[in-house]
Amino acid sequence: MAKNITDVSRDDLSKVSDEELQKCSKEELLRRLRKVDAEKMNLMLEHGNMMKDVNRRLQLHLHEIRSLKEVNQKLQEDNQELRELCCFLDDDRQKGKKLSREWQRFGRYTASVMWKEVGVFQQKLKELESNQDSVMRENLELKEIIIMLDDERNGAGSRSSIDSQSSLSNLNGGSATVRDVGDGSSTSSTGSAGSPDHHHSHIHKPTEGKITSIRRSMDDLSTNHLLRNIPNGLNDSSSNYIRQLETKVRILEDDNKQLLSQQGSVGDLKTLRKGLSLYHSESQLSSLSQFQDTLQNGSIRIAGGDLAPTVTGYLPAAQKPEAVVHAMKVLEVHENLDRKIPEDYEEDLSEKEKAIVREMCNVVWRKLGDAAGTKPSIRQHLSGNQFKGPL
């Protein structure tokens, strides 16, 4: 029976009932008790070791947790700093983007303004170039006109007065006395003293409106005479302007002729010498050049048939050629310049203007002499009227 209890204790004492334990002896129970205590102590030691190991591991884990917390805290701080830095950089990026957009708008605006300014300046440059070209052309034309006028003035000044003297001496049959042209004086014969100007000495003075119209017509006639000498190298605008002036001159000449016919005689010009003395010469040039052109074309026919002088040595004014009538006017102007001018006329003509009128009269006589050399009818009129022009 004791063997059975021993076998049971070996397996498990907890499974042994109390009755069986009561049946065991004391020595067996003590032995089992000590054995159980020893096992218990071993278990407690193992448990303590295990607890120490667990505590040690727990401490290690705690240290790891603490270190991880510290690392996590540092990482959080770094993350916060990075966030702040990202926010700052994002603000800078937004500011830079906004600034870049503003600069782009400003650049587009400045570029458009610059393009507009460049276009305006290019247009102005083109206008300036065109104006420069027109000014250069006008300067060239003016240079040509000035050179032509200088050549004409030099040619007119270099002409010898002996040519006109010889031509007029031949016309008058050598009976006229020779006088110098340079003194600016002129002699009138008895024929001029008995000219139609003296037959109409009691004619009323024209009205102020007629004087103004004649003065304007004479100004245009003088302008026309200067424009006739302009060379053909000018542009179309200048030639059109010249043609318009010539048309205006022809209209004014017709009006002037009608006004002169209404006055009744050539002697009316004597009453206008105060206002028109400076314009007679250039009007004679224009009228005489037209008469010379018609003489060259052979289209002039003297009215009245015969050219024989009348008892007094003159033909009626309607039967005289236009050149002879104008020559009488020029001679009258030349004679009036040599006379003593009244006090109310002293301010009208200066010495320079008198010299210009004398020079124009000389030119008219020279042209008249050239025309008379080609047409015998003019020579007969000049010799019949016994004109003595400046020599």
From Swiss-Prot:
Region entry Disordered, spans: 154-212
Entry keyword Coiled coil: yes
Keyword annotations from UniProtKB, A to Z: Cell junction, Coiled coil, Developmental protein, Tight junction
GO cellular component: adherens junction; apical junction complex; bicellular tight junction
Parts forming coiled coils: 23-87, 121-146
InterPro entries: CCDC85
Main location: other
Organism superkingdom: Eukaryota
Localisation: Cell junction, Tight junction; Cell junction, Adherens junction
Ranges annotated as biased composition (Low complexity): 158-175, 183-195
UniProt family annotation: Belongs to the CCDC85 family.
Function: May play a role in cell-cell adhesion and epithelium development through its interaction with proteins of the beta-catenin family. May play an important role in cortical development, especially in the maintenance of radial glia.
Protein name: Coiled-coil domain-containing protein 85C-A
Gene field: ccdc85ca
